Structure formats: C-alpha cells, structure tokens
Design a protein with these regions (language model features):
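Solvent-exposed, glycine/polar-rich loop segments of beta-barrel outer-membrane systems
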Residues: 274, 330-332, 371-379, 410-431, ...
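Outer membrane beta-barrel translocator domains of Type V secretion systems
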Residues: 269-453, 559-566, 571
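Feature marks extracellular polysaccharide-active and adherence modules
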Residues: 5-10, 24, 29-31, 39-44, ...
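Glycine-rich beta-solenoid repeat tracts in large extracellular/virion proteins
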Residues: 3-12, 37-42, 46, 51, ...
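Extracellular beta-strand/loop-rich repeat segments of large surface/secreted proteins
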Residues: 118, 124-218
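Membrane-embedded beta-strands of outer-membrane beta-barrel proteins
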Residues: 28, 61, 94, 340-342, ...
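Low-complexity acidic/polar repeat-biased segments
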Residues: 234-272
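Outer membrane beta-barrel transmembrane domains
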Residues: 387, 447, 476-580
Length: 580
C-alpha cells in the first residue's frame, strides 16, 4: 500500500549545522482505493551535532472513502545528537466522513510530535467526524514522544450518530453536535476497547437542536472497565440551538460508562444578540417596503400624471429604482436592492382640475447584511404586491393623493453564530403579508422662468404581519408584526437647462414606529423575547437629477438621492414618459 502526503519535507544536516523545517497549510483528500499511512503534513529535521527544529502546522486530511492504515493530520519529528531539538504539531485536522480502516494496529492521529530527547508539543489539533464512516480505529488527539506538551486537542462529532471506534485518547476538548433525529437509547459515539475515557481537566460541550424533545440523550459510551473518568476541573456545557444553555444537564451515569445529557436542566436564555439578529431581517424587510413606497410616490406618480395627460384612456406608467441604505436599528442592517412600480393611469377632468386614478403592481428584490455586535447575518428579501391610487390636481397647483397596496414579502436569513468554543450555522426562511397606504398633499408652482417647484407632505403607513420560522438548528421563533408610520416633507425644483432640466430636492423624514422582536418558544411551553430593533428616528436627504427628451415622444429622468441620519446611503431612481 502506498503512503499519501499532503506536504512532505525532510532536512538532515551534518558538521554541527542546524536543521530546521516547517510544513504548513498542506492537505490531502482521499475518496477511494487502499492507502497505507496518510499524512496531511510531515516535517522531519535531523542534525548530527546542531539544533533540530520541525513543525507541522495547519495541515488537513479529508477521508471520504477508501481503506486506510494509520492517518496523521500533521506529524513533526526532530532529532539531534548534541544540540537542542523541538518538534511541534499544531492546528492540524483530520476530517472523517467515510472510509474503512484496517483495524489491527490502525490509528487516526490529529497531531503527532516526536522528539525523544527534546521538546515535543501537540496542541490545537482536531479530529472531526461527520457522515457514516466504517468502524474507526484508535482516535488520538495530540500525541507526543519526548518532553511532551499536549493541550487543547479536540474530538468533534458533528450531526451524526452510531459511530464506533476503538478509543478516544489525548483529547482535551470533546464537542458533540447532536443530530435532530438522535433518540433516547442511541449513542453518538461508542468505544470498544479496554482503554478508558479520561475527561479530567477536559472541556466537554454538547450542542442540542432547539427542537429536541427527548428527555435523555447519549453522547458517548464505552465498553472499557475503566469507564469514563472526570474530576473537579472537568467543564461540561450544554447549548440548546442558538438560544441558550442548560445548567447541570451533562453527567456520567451510575455505571460510569455513559456520558449523558438530560433536557430538564435549568435553561438560561443567552441568545439576546442572536435572537435580535434574527429580528433584524424583519426590520430590514419593512424598511425595504418603505423604499418601494417612496419610489412610487416620487417617480411613479409623476410618470402616471404625465402619461394620463397624453392619453384618452388608461395609459401605462413605470418607475424603477435601486438603493444601498443602512438603517440604524440600535444595531444596523444594510439593504441593497431594486424596486419597481408599474401600472395604468387614467385622467378625468372637471373644468381645469384633474382626477387621476389607476391600478399598480409593485415588486422589489434585495439583499441585506445585519450586524448585532459580533453576530453578522445576511440574506435576501423579496416582495410582490398590487394596489391602486388616486390623485387630484387643481389649477392653483395644489394636489391631494393617496394609495393602498397589499402583497407578500419573502425573507431568508443565514449566519454563523459563535456558541461556546465553536461556531453554529443557522438559517431560516419565512414570509409575511403586508399592507401599505399613503396620504399626501402638496403644491406645484411654475415660475416665470420655467422653474417648477413642488412642495409636499406625505404620510406612509406599512404593516408587515408577524411570521414564524423554525431555524435549521431547530429553534422555533415567532416574529412580531412591524408597524411603520413615516412622515416625510420636502421640496423639489425642476429647472430648465439647455438640452433638458436639472432636478434638485431635499426632504426630511421621521419614522414613528418600525419596532419588531423575535420570541423563542422552547419545548415545554416557556418563551423568551429578544431586544427590539427599531427604525424610529429622523432622516434627511438631498437629491440631484436630470430630465431630458430622448426622442420626440419620450422623456426620461434619472435622480440620485443621498440620505443621512437614521437612514443612510444612496438611492437611484429612473422613469420614462411616453406621449401617445
């Protein structure tokens, strides 16, 4: 059988010359066939009379299929006859998701430092087991020969069960991510040999799905007469989803051969930031609906008015915009996306006054990043809605307007959340109905030089209904409805120029609401509510744009609006007017 190396380096010196070698960041992936010894990284330094230094750092082995003998994530050997010597195996990882093993004399070693006459250090090495590999041999975290230091070497069993191995030795951390289908009486890891499991001074962590209802779960069991041993320095912690911890929930049973978790431990909700991060999605989605409403009342109604004036019946209109806005919520959420409003408008005249009305369709799609202290979430938001509008324009320039819209929003979320010594990935997707309305009043006045000034005051209401979601980690959350009340006033000038018209504008907006929250519902009936993100506060904007005739019967306009305050960033809008 052949040896397999991700990285392999050997140095031998004579005449008192020092020997130094490092192998870092190498990896090997095996999906089939038969292999002898497998090394993610191998470093060897030998000197007859000088110093010797060998290090294997950050190397990896991925075992996905095949047959193996002995596997090393990283191995360092140092030897000298007269000088000092150091061998370090650090930060190496063996990932096991498949394969079979020649059991007689086989072992899987995360990090091995061999230096019989000097210093040997094996630290921060990891064996991680996923999937359904065949029966495993001896599992060894950090092995040393010489004046050895073995510290913070970890065994991780992730979302799998029914794994068997000979033993688990020289680990200082044990991490169990329980699968959602782990039932009472099933073990995640079973050990066969007579070698006991030493948890003295070790950190043991269990990550349970938030949806788990089994009263008692088996993390580890051993057939060894020596059993599982602990001491006062053993630290056991149980995490439930991303939402909290269970106190005094992990223990070794009366036989001394099973490491168990029971769910009746005292629950402590520690997911304040995590839950608030989940709720940021709802706040961001409501703000995104508000961006769409602004697009319709600014560019959409202007286009509808112009189109209706040139047609005898219903005339189509459209407005499109894009924005990159940061919404301060106590933390913040950054939204990027596009909004579209299309519809038909019709004009009815009473003397010189005009009454405009018609149906509309609105659509938006965007992405977001939310930040709550160290928690960074991201995802997408989409909405689709229909509605109608009415607007009255008088000869003195006064106008009165209103609209009603309703539809559905879809949101998704994903984040890698720090829990204990590791990171837990969680995600969800959900949807919610929404309804929106606005009322506005203003006046358009045209000066003798052709400059048009529009002053307006508009009130916007948006309600995004509450929603529920079960996270990929099993936690069940309810999200409260978001009620947004925004008042916006501003002025816009359209000034004729050679080849077109310059658009300048400014506005002030105040959000009176926009609060939301996330509530965790724990199996058993208890619930815990997150801090509330809020969109409440002042924002201001400055706008500049250009309007020009593209052809004889078509005029286009584009505008850029910069925002500051509670809502910060830039929005871009564009519209087209056809004369029929």
């Amino acid at each position: 059988m052949q040896r397999a190396y991700g990285g392999n380096a050997k140095v031998e010196t004579s005449g008192g010359t020092d020997a130094s070698v490092q192998v870092t960041g190498s990896s090997v992936t095996i999906t089939g066939g038969r292999s002898g010894n497998v090394f993610g990284g191998y470093a060897s330094a030998r000197s007859d009379a000088g110093n010797a230094y060998a290090a294997a750092r950050g190397n990896a082995v991925h075992l996905q299929g095949g047959v193996y003998q002995t596997v090393y994530g990283g191995m360092a050997e140092a030897q000298t006859n007269a000088g000092s010597s150091t061998a370090i195996a650090e930060g190496n990882t063996v990932y096991i998701s498949g394969g079979n093993y020649n059991m007689h004399g086989s072992s899987i070693v995360a990090g091995f430092a061999r230096n019989p006459a000097g210093i040997a250090i094996a630290r921060n090495n990891t064996i991680e087991i996923t999937g359904a590999p065949g029966p495993l041999p001896y599992l060894i975290g950090g092995n040393t020969i010489g004046s050895g230091i073995s510290e913070n070497n970890a065994l991780i069993v992730r979302r799998t069960k029914g794994i068997t191995a000979d033993s688990a030795e020289h680990f200082q951390r044990f991490v169990f991510y329980a699968p959602a289908d782990l039932a009472a009486g099933e073990a995640m890891l079973s050990l066969r040999s007579t070698v006991g499991v030493k948890l003295e001074g070790a950190a043991v962590e269990a990550y349970l799905p938030g949806s788990s209802t089994a009263h008692e779960l088996t993390l580890l069991q051993t057939a060894s007469p020596a059993g599982i041993t602990t001491d006062a320095a053993t630290k056991m912690t149980v995490y439930e989803g991303i939402s909290g911890t269970l106190a005094n929930a992990m223990y070794v049973d009366s036989t001394g051969k099973k490491l168990l978790v029971r769910r009746d431990g005292a629950f402590q909700f520690t997911g304040g930031d995590n839950a608030k991060s989940l709720a940021e999605t709802m706040a961001g989605a409501a703000a995104f609906l508000g961006t769409g409403a602004h697009l319709f009342t600014d560019g959409g109604l202007a286009s509808a008015s112009a189109e209706a004036a040139s047609a005898s019946g219903f005339a189509p209109f459209a407005a499109m915009g894009g924005a990159s806005l940061r919404h301060e919520t106590g933390s913040h959420v950054e939204m990027k996306g596009m909004n579209l409003a299309v519809g038909f408008s019709r004009e009815l005249k009473r003397g010189n006054d005009r009454l405009l009305f018609g149906p509309l369709v609105e659509y938006g799609r965007g992405s977001y990043d939310s930040y709550v202290n160290a928690v960074h979430g991201d995802g997408t938001v989409r909405y689709l809605g229909v509605g109608g509008f009415v607007r009255r324009e008088q000869t003195n320039g006064m106008f009165y307007e209103g609209s009603l819209r309703f539809g559905r929003s879809d949101m998704d979320y994903a984040a890698d959340i720090r829990m204990g010594s590791g990171t837990v990935h969680t995600s969800y997707d959900t949807d919610a109905n929404y309804i929106g309305a606005h009322l506005g009043i203003g006046q358009q006045v045209t000066a003798k030089n052709g400059t048009e000034r529009e002053m307006y005051l508009r009130y916007f209401y948006t309600r995004q209904d509450g929603a529920s979601a079960t996270l990929s980690t099993g936690d069940r959350y309810d999200f409260s409805a978001v009620d947004s009340h925004r008042l916006r006033t501003g002025v816009r000038w359209t000034m004729p120029q050679t080849g077109g018209a310059l658009i300048l504008g400014t506005s002030v907006q105040y959000e009176f609401g926009g609060d939301t929250s996330a509530t965790y519902h724990r199996p058993g009936g208890l619930s815990y509510t997150s801090p509330s993100p809020s969109l409440k506060g002042f924002s201001g904007s400055l706008e500049v744009g250009w309007k020009a005739a593209v052809r004889e019967n078509m005029t286009a306009n584009v505008a850029v609006e910069g925002w500051m305050g509670k809502q910060r960033g830039v929005s871009l809008s564009a519209g087209v007017e056809w004369m029929f």
